Amino acid sequence: MTAAAAAIVSRQQLVLCVDECHLHWGDALGYVWGPQGKRVSLPMTNGQERQTYYGALDVLTGRAFTWSAPGGDSDQTVRFFKALRRRFQGRRMVILWDGASYHRSAEVQAYLQQVNAGGAETAWRIQCVMFAPYAPQQNPMEDVWLAGKTAVRRMWQTLSTFAEVKQGFCAHIEKTIFQFGEKIFHFF
């Protein structure tokens, strides 16, 4: 077993698939059956409401973590990294993510340089590896977002506020253990 694999198995180093998602109030919409030939009326609230989430999927445990943000940008990405470091108590992390422009921004790079303190790559606190360009199918966090939105759609009749939609979305993601097996390991 290599030193890197041993560090991952011993949980000294985490491998996290990271992504951002915009949850919209409309994501909770479902279908309803009604009498044939009659229009069914349902009360509507603001369909424009949305919440941005950053998420991280631990590839070893299958556990996902969500973090709400006002939007997806460089500042929020740095804040998310800080939240990850607090949550995972400063353990080393390999971040697998897409090539969004703010992932490559000067602000994010400056934060990574500060955290990694110019050390050898094998000792970096946070190491970022990009998925192939325009290949969201490589990132299992995309499937986690879909599972959360699907769960919300299945309970749409019980969700009367956007706050309830957000709570249901996050609760489903954080209580589920995701198993992607081959999808994760085809990347390596």
Question: Which role fits each region the language model picked out?
Answer:
Residues 1-82:
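Extended, low-complexity cationic-aromatic segments
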Residues 12-13, 91, 124-127:
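Short glycine-/polar-rich loops that comprise or flank the Walker A/P-loop
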Residues 26-28, 105-109:
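A short acidic (Asp/Glu
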Residues 20-24, 58-61, 100-103, 134-136, ...:
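Short, solvent-exposed loop/turn segments at secondary-structure junctions
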